[in-house]
From Swiss-Prot:
Organism the protein comes from: Macaca speciosa (Stump-tail macaque)
Tissue distribution of the protein: Red blood cells.
Binding residues annotated for O2, in chain numbering: H58
Protein name: Hemoglobin subunit alpha-1/2
Protein family (similarity comment): Belongs to the globin family.
Any GO MF annotation of the entry: peroxidase activity
Sites of N6-acetyllysine modification: K16
Subunit structure: Heterotetramer of two alpha chains and two beta chains.
Keyword Heme: yes
Modification Phosphotyrosine occurs at: Y24
Gene Ontology cellular component terms for the protein in this record: blood microparticle; haptoglobin-hemoglobin complex; hemoglobin complex
C-alpha cells in the first residue's frame, strides 16, 4: 500500500519525467529486451533494434499507462482494468515480465533523474510499480 509520502514522491518524480515519458518507456523496453532476452517472445512482429518505431510506440503506450496510473493512484484497479484484461486474456503475458520491466524502468529513471532519484523516491517508485504490476496481473487469477 502506498503511503501519502509515496504518492507525493511518485507524482513529483513523474512530473519531472514530463515530456520524456515515451522516450524513457522505450528505453526501459530496450533495456528489458537486452537484459532479459526471453521477453522478446511477446513481440515477434516487432523490429526490436535500437530506436525502432515499434519499440518507441510501445514505450509510449507503457508511459501513457503509467501516467494514467499516477493520475489515478487511489483507484488503479479501475483505471487499469482494460489493460489488465488485455494482458491477462488476450496477450497472456507471464506476470514475471512486469517485474522485469519495472526494474528496467527504475534503472532508466535513475539514469535520467539522478538528483531526484533519492533512496526515498526509489522506494516509492518501486512500491508504485509493484502496485501497477499487481493490478495488471489481478485478472490472471
Amino acid at each position: 500500500v502506498l503511503s501519502p509520502a509515496d504518492k507525493t514522491n511518485v507524482k513529483a518524480a513523474w512530473d519531472k519525467v514530463g515530456g520524456h515519458a515515451g522516450e524513457y518507456g522505450a528505453e526501459a523496453l530496450e533495456r528489458m529486451f537486452l537484459s532479459f532476452p526471453t521477453t522478446k517472445t511477446y513481440f515477434p512482429h516487432f523490429d526490436l533494434s535500437h530506436g525502432s518505431a515499434q519499440v518507441k510506440g510501445h514505450g509510449k503506450k507503457v508511459a501513457d499507462a503509467l501516467t494514467l496510473a499516477v493520475g489515478h493512484v487511489d483507484d488503479m484497479p479501475h483505471a487499469l482494468s482494460a489493460l489488465s484484461d488485455l494482458h491477462a486474456h488476450k496477450l497472456r503475458v507471464d506476470p514475471v515480465n512486469f517485474k522485469l520491466l519495472s526494474h528496467c524502468l527504475l534503472v532508466t529513471l535513475a539514469a535520467h533523474l539522478p538528483a531526484e532519484f533519492t533512496p526515498a523516491v526509489h522506494a516509492s517508485l518501486d512500491k508504485f510499480l509493484a502496485s501497477v504490476s499487481t493490478v495488471l496481473t489481478s485478472k490472471y487469477r
